[in-house]
């Protein structure tokens, strides 16, 4: 997985955009509970700007983070308290933190879905295994692919988010195309901000495109077992409810 250009161009307003998403929040509590229970140290793979990881460090948990985007890590490092966290710029499938071992490794907000090939998925899981302390836990989440949506070849562009950036409204428009043969969806997001009323900020548009894979339940279990995870729990939401047909996610807790 190369550095996703979308994160290089959108890192500066990533936090503002995703703070406006009501569906986020329960995931941070889920990973915080695991982190506190582990006692640390904790590693987030695909840590981004620190939305989930930074609050763990403020609780006194020893933390480290890995991300492939220099721009996202720059945003992370600007935040108060980030100096206590060891941050590394590396890809999910090839990160190497030497002899460091962690009681909990996690990958939040569907970061695992950025791994487009089976080889990359297995490589990432192998790197996670190599960095787990004895008895350590790996946790991550992906969305549950609803058949009525993945059956669609194309979802036309539609506005799906409005947030405030530097005192002015910014709108996000998203278009999705799917390739069911490869289980990949191409997501194009267009961020639009009008010129400010005083004319000091011109109109702005940023367009980004990235790919996400999707997984079926037993496909995930197979990948985990192939890489040495023998105790795998799966849930359908961040409240640890069982997986049902209409569950929004697959949450994995593996040892």
Question: What are these regions, as identified by a protein language model?
Answer:
Residues 135-142:
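Conserved beta-strand signature within the Rossmann-like core of class I S-adenosyl-L-methionine
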Residues 1-40:
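Conserved class I S-adenosyl-L-methionine
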Residues 95-104:
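A short acidic, Gly/Pro-enriched loop at the edge of an enzyme's catalytic core
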Residues 50-95:
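Class I SAM-dependent methyltransferase SAM/SAH-binding core
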């Amino acid at each position: 997985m190369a550095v996703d250009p979308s994160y290089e161009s959108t890192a500066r307003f990533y936090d503002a955009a995703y703070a406006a998403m009501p569906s986020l929040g329960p995931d941070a509590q889920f990973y915080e509970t695991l982190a506190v229970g582990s006692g640390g140290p904790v590693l987030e793979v695909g840590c981004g700007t620190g939305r989930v990881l930074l609050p763990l460090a403020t609780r006194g948990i020893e933390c480290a983070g890995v991300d492939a985007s220099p721009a996202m890590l720059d945003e992370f490092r600007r935040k108060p308290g980030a100096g206590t966290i060891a941050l590394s710029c590396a890809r999910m499938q090839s990160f190497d933190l030497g002899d460091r071992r962690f009681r909990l490794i996690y990958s939040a907000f569907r970061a695992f879905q950025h791994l487009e090939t089976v080889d990359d998925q297995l490589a990432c899981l192998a790197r996670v295994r190599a960095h787990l302390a004895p008895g350590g836990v790996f946790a991550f989440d992906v969305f549950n692919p609803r058949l009525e949506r993945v059956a669609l070849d194309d979802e036309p562009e539609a506005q799906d988010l409005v947030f405030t950036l530097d005192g002015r409204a910014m709108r996000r428009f998203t278009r999705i195309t799917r390739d069911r043969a490869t289980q990949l969806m191409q997501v194009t997001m267009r961020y639009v901000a009008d010129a400010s009323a005083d004319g000091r900020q011109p109109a702005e548009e940023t367009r980004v495109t990235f790919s996400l894979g999707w997984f079926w339940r037993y496909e995930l279990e197979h990948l985990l077992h192939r890489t040495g995870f023998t105790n795998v729990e799966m849930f359908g939401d961040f409240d640890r409810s069982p997986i049902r047909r209409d569950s929004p996610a697959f949450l994995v807790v593996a040892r």
